[in-house]
Amino acid sequence: SPKERAECHFQNGVKMITALSCCADSHSDLGLITFVAIDQINIAKSFGVTDSSMCTQFAKLNLKAGESSMEKFNFMSGFSYIEHGISFLPKESKWNSSSYDLCRSLHEAACLACYVNALPTKANEYISVLLENAQCLEHKLKAYYVMVKNLTSSGDFKQALKKTFDVLIELGETFPTEITPEIIQEELSNTKSLLNNFTKESILSSPKLMDEKKLWAIKFMNNLSGPLSITNYQMGPLIACRMVQLSSKYGYCSESAFGFLGYGQAQISVFEDVDEGYRWGKIALSLLESLGGKGYLPKMRCLFNSYVSLWKEPFHASSNVLLHTHSEAMLVGDVEYASVSAFFYCRQALVCGQNLLLAEKECKAIASKMVQLKQIQMCYGQVNTYIFILKMNGNYGKVNPFPEIFDGKIANEEELLNLALSSGKRINAKGILSNRFQVAFWLGQFEEAAELAEKAKHPPKMSFMEVYHVFCEGLTAFQLARRSSSSSASKWMTIGEEAVTRFRLYEKCSTWNWENNLFLLEAEYHQCKQEEDKAAAKYRASIKSAQEHRFVHEEALALEFYGDFLRTIRSVDESKEKYGNARLCYEKWGAHAIIPRLEEKIGQIQGTE
């Protein structure tokens, strides 16, 4: 009978537990036996068979099994053990003095397991119980930590930031409410002085961070990178500097490495010192590996390849790393940065000229995965990328990117923009406006593109978003300069010339990524100046560079613009040839929304023959 089977399971479990207590740590398969023993006990309990006098021991064993499973990144099994452990505690007295620590540990583990397993409602239930019964701030910190991650994942950045800064105040860390360039530069200067004699070896030989409050302060600061990058990126350098300063004073932990990475990012974004920023990014990677932060490595690789490596390494390399990092993050239970990695992979794959039909399938699958993982915040950016792809490959209006995302609350792009604006997600709003601008540019709607460029103005300096804003705005300006009267042409020429200057800085950082873009901007500049020989040479150089570095979409653009130039100097046959080659490249890219424009241009030439 079921009861007899349950009794058998129970007796087997008790015998193994008794054997474990006798053999202590001498048995080589002790870990496996522990899991088997507690599995037997849990099976028996599901049939109502247990021994109340041993409940505390069973709860402790389940806690041990759950924590061991989660250390091996098996969060589903871990949560099952934790739930069983809680079920063994007496309902009326589980929070009394004798079982308080055990009950608290089980609820702390349950919070984390629920978050990783995409069970936010369940996580909030455990968080509420823990906060209601915890006796001091230190006993509430793990609950607050998971609460902040839950809020971040759901996109409620306002509450996530408020709770984080409230906790940091209780931990003795305060920050200015208004950030000025002077404050940022002062903090970076102070941190630079602190790091003058820094070596990786000196950190590894330094004491570990033992002060629990300072350790938790750094942990909470490390949680801020996501929300601040969307709502208040100017705050990022201050957080990074504080993490470095606390680590230098009190000792180092795995999270300290992210302070060094943030410091490196600030060298790029504030001082435009790419070499120094890249150097600190590499140090941060190496430091985390040496400090043993295995679970944090995917997050570190994601941030490094999304914000730092693009200035020195080919996009084709970093996009592949991000795809691999997505899988790594899933394996260690970092569902937030699994989603962040996937988002940045999609974005970087696009600028590599990934086929847009393949990109559509990948983007849709990743958006669905984000919903499944309850990483709703990342859906803003992912859906925005998805819309861009659909507009470029001609499927916009045929495919609905919104049905399963945001629980049906968002039905179109305008509602997505309004939600981003109303919730204070400035970078998400900028991203939507920026993609609209770039679509108008690629579709040759230059007057509309110029208007949208103004709305999408002022993205973060030395950022991925800034680079492609400057590129498209510069080319748009040169197009409009040639179409305008002399009075307004000077305005457009100024914008175009500023883009050329900016791209000379970018190209010095990475010839692979941005040489072809610079050559195309220079070609358009020379055409506006009626310097035909120089323009032709730069067009050819742009086409060659795009071919060599495998940017098929930018090769197509350079071919088309070269064809336009040849047409203006009445080199009709060669112009037709370039248009034909451009069409082939656009087809390879999958940009079917652009191809009718090339067909029209080719038809116009044929009509004059």
Residue positions per predicted region:
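Amphipathic helix-loop-helix modules that constitute alpha-helical solenoid scaffolds
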Residues: S1-F35, K45-K64, L151-L238, L350-K364, ...
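Residue register of alpha-helical TPR repeats
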Residues: Q11, K15, S53, Q57-K60, ...
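Conserved small-residue packing positions in alpha-helical repeats and bundles
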Residues: V14, S21, I41, A65-G66, ...
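Residue at a conserved register position within TPR or TPR-like alpha-solenoid repeats
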Residues: L20, A24-H27, N62, S69, ...
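TPR-repeat structural position
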Residues: L30, C55, K72-F75, P120, ...
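Short coil/turn linkers that connect adjacent helices within long alpha-helical scaffolds
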Residues: Q40, F47-S52, K72, K91-S97, ...
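Hydrophobic, small-residue-rich alpha-helical packing segments that form membrane-like cores
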Residues: S53, C241-G251, Y263-N355, K361-K374
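Generic long, charged, amphipathic alpha-helical segments
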Residues: Q57, S488-T568
